[in-house]
């Protein structure tokens, strides 16, 4: 879905779990809420104006710089990190500290929190969370190719694979309290 939007020169700018819907009966994934999306020719807002959800923003988006599809891929990386670990890669007590971390500090390796994950998947996440857009996947299609390749690899018999609810059991669910 993101690759299609990016090929149309549209950058979502607010990829986060609430904007990704999955129909488990059909395995269809939909990206929703293109409310702050922009055509890449005009993907920079007024100077100093930042739109989106800060914890999921790329370093360049937080800095108010020009963004392209690779910024959405960074946000997707944050979303996948949270999906796999139940935690955000960057957490801070203030907006300034959060922005500093996103711009300057590497995310904790996903394998620290989930040592059972394939090394190749950890590398993909690390690439998605790269500070520089040039170091990320060039497109959603390139990312999908990497993820398909990983999914097609056999799972080691000794590897612990948690049930889906294990990975998100600590994440509060709407209407069920925190």
Where are each of the predicted segments found?
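Activation-loop N-terminal segment of eukaryotic-like protein kinases
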Residues: 22-26
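C-terminal or otherwise distal, non-catalytic regulatory regions appended to signaling enzyme catalytic cores
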Residues: 163-178
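Pre-DFG segment of protein kinase catalytic domains
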Residues: 30-33
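Conserved catalytic-core motifs of eukaryotic protein kinase domains, centered on the activation segment
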Residues: 40-43
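C-terminal lobe helix-coil module of Hanks-type protein kinase domains
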Residues: 13, 18-21, 53-159
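Conserved, function-defining core regions and hallmark residues within catalytic/recognition domains
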Residues: 50
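Protein kinase catalytic-loop region centered on the HRD/HxD motif
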Residues: 1-10
């Amino acid at each position: 879905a993101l690759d299609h939007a990016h090929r149309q020169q549209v950058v979502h700018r607010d990829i986060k779990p609430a904007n990704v819907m999955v129909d488990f009966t059909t395995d269809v994934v939909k990206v929703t809420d293109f409310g702050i999306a922009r055509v890449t020719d005009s993907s920079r807002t007024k100077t100093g104006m930042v739109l989106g959800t800060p914890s999921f923003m790329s370093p360049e988006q937080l800095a108010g710089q020009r963004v392209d599809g690779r910024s959405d891929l960074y946000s997707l990386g944050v979303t996948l990190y949270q999906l796999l670990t139940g935690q955000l890669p960057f957490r801070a007590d203030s907006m300034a500290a959060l922005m500093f971390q996103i711009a300057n500090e590497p995310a904790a390796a996903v394998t620290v929190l989930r040592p059972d994950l394939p090394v190749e998947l950890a590398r993909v996440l690390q690439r998605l969370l790269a500070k520089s857009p040039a170091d990320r996947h060039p497109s959603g299609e390139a990312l999908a190719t990497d993820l398909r390749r990983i999914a097609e690899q056999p799972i080691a018999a000794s590897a612990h694979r948690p049930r889906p609810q294990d990975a998100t059991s600590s994440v509060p669910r709407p209407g069920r309290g925190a």
